Design a protein with these regions (language model features):
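Short N-terminal segments immediately surrounding and downstream of signal-peptide cleavage
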Residues: 23-38
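Hydrophobic secondary-structure block in the mid-to-C-terminal portion of proteins
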Residues: 147-178
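Outer-membrane beta-barrel domain signature
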Residues: 40-50, 77-81, 116-122, 156-163
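Solvent-exposed, flexible loop/coil residues
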Residues: 5, 37, 41
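Gram-negative (and chloroplast) outer-membrane scaffold detector with strong preference
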Residues: 31, 35, 54-143, 167-178
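Cleavable N-terminal export/targeting peptides
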Residues: 1-26
C-alpha cells in the first residue's frame, strides 16, 4: 500500500511539475523554417518558395487567450520579389499536463515587395489557423514545433487578376514561463 501511494505521488509530482499551470505568464518566440505554397499565380503556374525568414512571438497568461504576432518574408523562387506577411494572432494554450498544445487564429496583411511591386500589386489580406506542439525541456522552458495554414490573395492593380499565395508555414521556437 505504501509503495502504491509513493509511486502515485512521484508520478503526479513529475507530471504536474512540468505543466504550465504554475506559470503566471508565458512568452514564446520562434522562427519559420519552411514555407510551401498551395496556391498558384493567376495564370495557373505554381508559386515556389526559395527560403523564409522572420519571427513569431506570443504572450499569454493561464486560462485566458493570449496574443501574438507573426512577421516573416518569403523569397520567391526565380524572382527578385519577396512575400512579406504580418499576422496578429489570438491563441489558447490548452491545459494539458506534460505537453503544451496551442491552437490559434490570426488575421493580417501580405504584400509582394520588389522594385516595381508597389505599383503593380495591391496589398492583400491574410488569415491563418495554427497549432503548436511543445515539449518541456525543464519545468519552465519548452521547445515547440508549429504548423500554420495561411490563406492569402493579392490582386494586380491593373486588372482583375488575383494571385492565390496561400500555403503552409512550419516553425520552431522556445517558450518561457514565469
Amino acid at each position: 500500500m505504501k509503495r502504491n501511494i509513493l509511486t502515485a505521488f512521484a508520478a503526479t509530482s513529475l507530471i504536474f511539475s512540468s505543466t504550465q499551470a504554475f506559470a503566471l505568464i508565458n512568452f514564446s518566440a520562434g522562427i519559420p523554417f519552411s514555407h510551401s505554397f498551395s496556391g498558384n499565380w493567376y495564370d495557373g503556374s505554381a508559386v515556389e518558395s526559395d527560403g523564409v525568414s522572420g519571427m513569431f512571438i506570443q504572450v499569454g497568461v493561464p486560462i485566458f487567450p493570449g496574443v501574438g504576432m507573426d512577421s516573416y518574408k518569403t523569397k520567391l523562387k526565380d524572382s527578385t520579389a519577396e512575400l512579406a506577411t504580418t499576422i496578429y494572432n489570438l491563441y489558447y494554450l490548452l491545459p494539458i499536463p506534460v505537453i503544451n498544445l496551442t491552437l490559434g487564429v490570426g488575421a493580417g496583411s501580405t504584400e509582394l515587395q520588389c522594385a516595381a511591386c508597389s505599383s503593380a500589386f495591391e496589398k492583400g489580406s491574410a488569415t491563418q489557423w495554427y497549432a503548436s506542439f511543445g515539449m518541456p525541456i525543464i519545468p519552465l522552458f519548452d521547445l515547440h514545433l508549429s504548423y500554420r495554414s495561411v490563406s492569402s490573395k493579392i490582386k494586380e492593380k491593373s486588372g482583375t487578376n488575383e494571385h492565390d499565395l496561400s500555403g503552409n508555414v512550419m516553425g520552431l521556437g522556445i517558450g518561457f514561463n514565469f
